[in-house]
Structure formats: C-alpha cells, structure tokens
A protein has these predicted regions:
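Residues within the helices of the helix-turn-helix
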Residues: 7-8
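A detector for short, charged/polar N-terminal pre-domain segments
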Residues: 1-3
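Major-groove DNA-recognition helix of helix-turn-helix-type DNA-binding domains
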Residues: 12-41, 48-49, 55
Length: 57
C-alpha cells in the first residue's frame, strides 16, 4: 500500500467523492493533504486517523 494517494485513489479507497475530498483538503489545518507542485496528494495514514475520529462529513 502506498503512503500517498491521488484524490481519485482516495475516493475509491474511502468511498468519499472526489469533490468532497477536495473541499475537505481546502479546510484550514487539513493534516492529510500534501501538495506536490500543483497536485494534491492524500496521506493515507492521516486520512484514516481523521476518518476514525470524525462523526460526520
């Protein structure tokens, strides 16, 4: 398993839509996104931890 996922891969992995993931990444203090140039990459471990501790999106 890769540590970094594209938005599309993260969507397939979690079942969350790409647009919702993009909105979540745009929130101040988002800890599961890293920018590689202009491309957003999702940190799988931090995304899992975020989802484990989140009641509602």
């Amino acid at each position: 398993n890769r540590a970094l996922l594209t938005l599309e891969e993260a969507g397939a992995y979690t079942g969350i839509g790409v647009h919702k993931l993009r909105n979540m990444c745009d929130q101040e203090g988002c800890k599961f996104v890293i920018w590689v140039g202009a491309k957003r990459m999702i940190k799988r471990k931090q995304l899992d931890e975020f989802l484990d501790n989140t009641y509602s999106l």
